[in-house]
Amino acid sequence: RSCKKLLPVKQGERGLRQSDAVFHHTKQLPELMKQLFDKRYDLSAVGYSYAPRCAEGSYMPCFLVGENVAQAVSLACGADLEKTSHQVGHILAALYSCGKLDMLSSDKPFAAFHVSGGTTDLLLCEPDKAKLINITQIGGSRDLKGGQAIDRTGVRLGLSFPCGKELERLASESEHKIKPKASVDGLYCSLSGIENQCMKLIDESCSVADVAAYCIDCVCL
């Protein structure tokens, strides 16, 4: 069962300050927990994300809110507590959704591409019995992240943050596709040019649908 609620972001803003993110996590989690536990469950384990990535220095204070709730639920239910990173959670969700969880028990490494507002990483994933997955970044964006390019373009077009869903809808209405440009060096890329190109198209009065399509095509390229 899934219960979720987006954190509120003011119109025209491109995200939340960390202090505001902690506040809204703290405020909204009790309501979500009430929805989730409207009936009893026989839990064997509680999992939570302790950090954005499994990398030294990867830290965001809002993860402490989730960790505290997970620890409380674990103690109350007598369930095991399992921690991992937000990035590993995305990879596990992808494996689960495509019916490939068996890859975790294989001795063969695999590649994953994690694109979000904070990451655009090409990852070498090696199954590990203790850690589930050992992750090594082998490529990705050297500057702007894919989600940042999408959200910054969307906010400039007047969309509400996060902008991905609405930008994709606008892109589907485009009738004049603009050939995407990409700056690639081996397994790494640079996405900062996408933002500049999209802003230039907006200033030139290009249709919002065409700008949206161009932005998404560049990120997906």
Language-model region placement:
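A short helix-loop
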Residues: R1, S105-K108, H114-S116, D121-A209
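Phosphate/ATP-binding catalytic cores across multiple sugar-kinase/actin-like superfamilies
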Residues: E31-L36, Y214-L221
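Phosphate- and other anionic-substrate recognition elements at nucleic-acid/protein interfaces
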Residues: L32-M33, R40-D42, A51-L81
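Short glycine-aspartate micro-motif
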Residues: A45-G47, C62, F110-H114
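Acidic, glycine-rich active-site loops and adjacent beta-strand->loop/helix elements
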Residues: S49-C54, S85-I91, T119
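Conserved phosphate-binding catalytic cores of ATP/NTP-utilizing and phosphoryl-transfer enzymes
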Residues: A79, K83-F110
